[in-house]
Amino acid sequence: CQLCTTLYNVVLRAELEVTQRQNHSMTVGYVKPSEDAAIAGTYKDLKFKNNYDTPIYIEGLVSGNTLTFTAYGKDTRPEGRTVEFISETLGTTDPGAPVEKQDASLAPGARVKESSGHVGKKSRLWKVVYENGVETGREILHTDSYMASKAVYRVGPAAPSVPAVTEPSAPS
């Protein structure tokens, strides 16, 4: 979904009209909350349309492990207009205590992280418009909820207890 998120951010900055977008179920590490877009099966998709009177062209290029999207077209927005997108966290949900799953294949007392926990979040994305550096507009684009998830560890069997050694008492 990093591909979809990258395209979404290009579409936002070009100020194209987003007609469908869903967030990931949990926060992702490569963008701030509410700056993401997910695709999955037939139930999550990213759709947008050209709301300008002139054609646009969006090019995607891959070089090594880097994907770049570039939007081309005639910029019909007023000169001096800039936009900024601000992620605002409205609340968080603690993931709770980690889950421990017994794994007899591990050494006694061993503990191996299977998955990291995620803090749940509620966030929104603001679009802020500036004309010659002066804020002229601000709107909420969307509000999103991200699930919390507990960390999961596999744990080996309990370490065997060592019997206590008692010293014989001295004769009295």
Predicted features, each with a name:
Residues 2-172:
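Well-ordered beta-sheet/strand-loop patches within structured domains
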